[in-house]
Amino acid sequence: MFLVYLRNCMDFFFNSSFNYSLTSIDFYKTIFLIFANKIKNNFLYIISFQWFFNITYIINQLPSIDDELYIPIVRDFFNFNSLITYIYNISLTQIFSIFSFSAIHVYFIKRLYSENLTSILPALSGYFISEILFIICIYSGITNLFIILANWERFFIISGIIFFFYEGVNFIKENKNKNIYLKIPFIKHSTFFNSYRFFNFKEFFLGVFLFCLDSPSIFTLVSNLSLTPTVSNFEFFINSSFIQLVLFILIRSFFFYLSFIIIYPFILNKIHHNTYFQSDTLKKINIFIQKGFGMLLIFFSVSSIPFYTIEYFLGYLLGIIPKDISLFFTQLDPYFLSDSPGFYEQFYYGNTVVPFKAAKFDRGRYLLYPAYRELPPSYEDFIFKPIYLEWTKTLKSNNYIDRYLGSQKTTMQYIQTKATPIIKFFENLFPDANVRKSNKRKKILTQLLTDKFLGSHTKLNTYFNVPYAEKLLFFNRLSKSAFRINNKQYYNDLILSSIEEFVTFNENLIPNFETLTPFDKCTYRFSLSKNLLTSRLKPFVDFLDLFSAPEFDITPIYVKMAENILSTYDRKKFFAPLANFFKDETLNESKVKKKNAQPSLSREIEAIQGKIPLESILTEGIVALFPEWAYIKMELVGKLGSIIKEYQRYFNFLEIFNLYLRGHSFKLTVKQSIDLHYRQLYQTEAISYLRHYFNNNSYRKIRDDLDNFSKVLKINFIENTKNKTNKIKNLNTREDSKKLLISLEKDSKKFMKYLLFKTTRSFASKVYNHQFKGTLIDLIQWFSYSPYTSSMFKEINTKEMENVFIEAEEPSYLLSLNNDVKKYYPIIKYDQAFYKKDALDKGIIFDHILYKSLIEELYDDDLTLENSESLKNENKLSKKNLSLINSNIISPNQNIFDLLNMIIDYITITNYSLSKIDTLLNPFIEYMSFEPLCASNHNNLFVLSTAHYSINDIDLPVKNHNTNKWPLPSNILDYLVYNISDDKVSFKNPLAYIGMFLQIPYEKFGIDYKNTYIFKVDNYEELNEHEVFDQYMDFFARYEDPAYESLQLKFINLFLENSLDDTNKALCKNYLFSKNFMVPTAYIDCPFPILQHFYLAKNLRQLFFVRSPIRGGYKWAGSYTNNIINNKLYTDLLKIYNRIILLWHKIYTSIIYKFKRNNHGTLAQLVE
């Protein structure tokens, strides 16, 4: 983050030889700064065995904020001649650097102890006044001083050397026959105010000259405060007040002065008079110290310690120098690669303008380097192989680049095509900006948008496109032109028109978009528009906000956006219930369009206060406009995954509705209850919500409600639940189990009613309850024992529940249910595109008509829904094969592994389709989740049968199930490798092995296919990671394919993702290297999650998904790695998730039944 910020931090301080220097700015930052005065940090290269002579000229692009810094490996590795040459050069450099830097110390020390304290006051005054003026000039943007110092650096170095020897020789001569006795000088008032030397302008200008000599070191402070070309440091710079700067300089000057009058003489006095120095040998040392060079070394060493320690300590306290500097190596000079040699007429380096020169580089590109630096003499011989070259080589070996992006030119065309609406918007945005050439602007804007289109985690945006610096140059030039925004409406209209173009552009990418329901169209358009504003256009909106006076208000854009979206629908129909509610019969479409239309605000106030059921009115209006909402009411939504999706859809539309009313002066809001941040927090990060729930102050209200819950239900309920909990261990018959579950269901209803209604009665509170506590309620339902919840069966009597429970043993039980029961059955409706009411009534989950049209876009004409089953029966596997889920419904009380096995029999989506799916549905796929492709009855995925589990058992192996350790037995491996003939399957790419487990005749090897479960046995003792890893590698080696070369790296990197926290990383490692790997019966490589629960937890989701190196974002893990490794990965992660689910099941069961040990515990204690 602070890479560029630190690059010029020590530039002039260290780099007298015009070379790079690397400095460690981390835990030992201060120590490195101390010794950097004497030992040049280029020695770090020698320590790291990188002593190539020209390694100091590392050429690298200016990295973006999220990029890592890579140090290339030099060509002459362990070359002795290069080592000698390198040491020779930096040694000479170091000697001259020491002499130049020490000049000021020699002068001040000589004057201080040869005469008195006041003799150096004029020089000190000139020195510090020069320093303050210099920093003020830099702070104010006066950049000429920087250029002067850069161009005269050699002169100051030579002057410093001459001055050093001149003053040093005089000092030795003057003290040759004197016994130097150092005292701590004190300031005498008469001497201080009356000394003529205080007004000695000759000494004053000598101090100014000493500042110039010391400018390489003083530039350390300046560079810390200067504006550097990164967004983060720009924010840091404008937040640093000028008072802080002046205060820092004054305190720094005081300690600098204090170190001369107290620290140095005190130390030297102790050395001189210590009896330990009276031996003959040490007397000689003492004599040497009294001579010039010996004193210089001591003064030089001691001076840097208090000076820089105090300086950086004060910088920490004042907040000027950042505290969280985490980089270990830092580059100090900007070198860039560009396709255009003349683009960099000037570049803002810090707060200064630095001219750049261009030199020919390879592949028609140009090396741009600062004009005040010399071109490396042998730059053409550099080993310019950063990581991205090796990385692209690996990708090309697997045909990923050709498949997804093609050549560099194709990539740029692809980005420019996708960014056309926004580029058009930007090109018309700044008519008065100081950037006029359209080609340059298009190049800048393309790069500006590349990070968002290709993803923020990919390196392609850095190396396949224009340098990052061009984007910064664009904004810097705008800022230097004192740009101000006056006509806000003009920019509002531009943004809205751009959004409309962008939405229309993306709608055309979605197949069969017109077949979507009006509700899905509406919410999709709004989500896409809001995403555009909050992510892809956020830098621009922030820029408008920064340069507009008063602040740029984005609310009118949202309001207008919502109005445009709603304008495509029948507003009379929608607002009719609302008009009746406000008793304003004249509220119709014509009046809504008038700006002055205002309903009765008193009725609005009553609604917000909860006196009128406004929420029901809103629901009525939504249902009137979108009839399908009558079919999906909130109380009918089942498990957590579906309620997340439905809440998202519901609140997205509610936000549109709210913004529309706000634009028409209704001022009807749901306050902060549907704020975007909290909605995302609670709806899309369920497990994170559970984890933070116990320790975050913002959830105190919910936590207090839960604590009060025990008081409301009183002791009787607690005792009853305790007894019921104990009965679980003694269940003997299915009838006992059934009765207990029904009883527990009633208790759960009490708990849910308490959470829903035991609150304030305002409308905002009701939304709060539905949104936040409603999520908690579904979590409790999810982890309760009962396979049925109140959200599933609204008003079903006990007899009906008994019948359903008994019939649940039949796989096709749902088809035999009567209509009264079926209408309450919670079909999970993630996306309307895959559902139709008629199909649902028939028990079919998906809209095959729409899905079939999607398939025809992706696959051959002869491979459609009708013949997919015949392909399966013929035991043929094609890399274009796609078998859809049939209409069988999974029993609600079936184990999750049964569900997995049944799904595997019906769906196989190969990696071949991924590129087309990703292209056609992006960014549509960001809005719509395709979990329904592989899910049936999600409401009961994690209902745990009491026949196998109890609340006290987290890891219980399923009895009477055959398991096999990983790797697979050798006979099965041989079968896979040799017995699958080429005439049936052509494995040109190892990804085509996906689904081959479906063809294994398990019965032939004595494996019970139906009873082979993916389950984990809790045995982690005597863990041998290396042995297991070798087994993996041996297994990979059985297949001779070039793509396996990168498997090991991908395999390791998957578990070294920086985004994983330590807990998940350790948990993954335990499962990964466990000795008890279970063999999955089959595996699916699919661009979508197979099961609904994969979507729930953000941290766990990062385990199931890998970051795509092509477009960024999360993709199914099987998309970019081999199916076999994912086969194992999927198995392990499924077991990890199962373990966590069981753990939370235990926790929430304990919550429902109160706390086992006592009745006074807290939830935090329970979790501990």
Curated annotation (Swiss-Prot):
Keywords from the UniProt entry: Membrane, Plastid, Transmembrane, Transmembrane helix
Lineage top rank: taxon: Eukaryota
Coiled-coil stretches: none
One cellular component (GO) term of this entry: plastid membrane
Bilayer topology annotation: Multi-pass membrane protein
Principal subcellular localization: plastid
Keyword Metal-binding in record: no
Keyword Transport: no
Similarity annotation: Belongs to the ycf78 family.
The name this protein goes by in its record: Uncharacterized membrane protein ycf78
Species per Swiss-Prot/TrEMBL record: Helicosporidium sp. subsp. Simulium jonesii
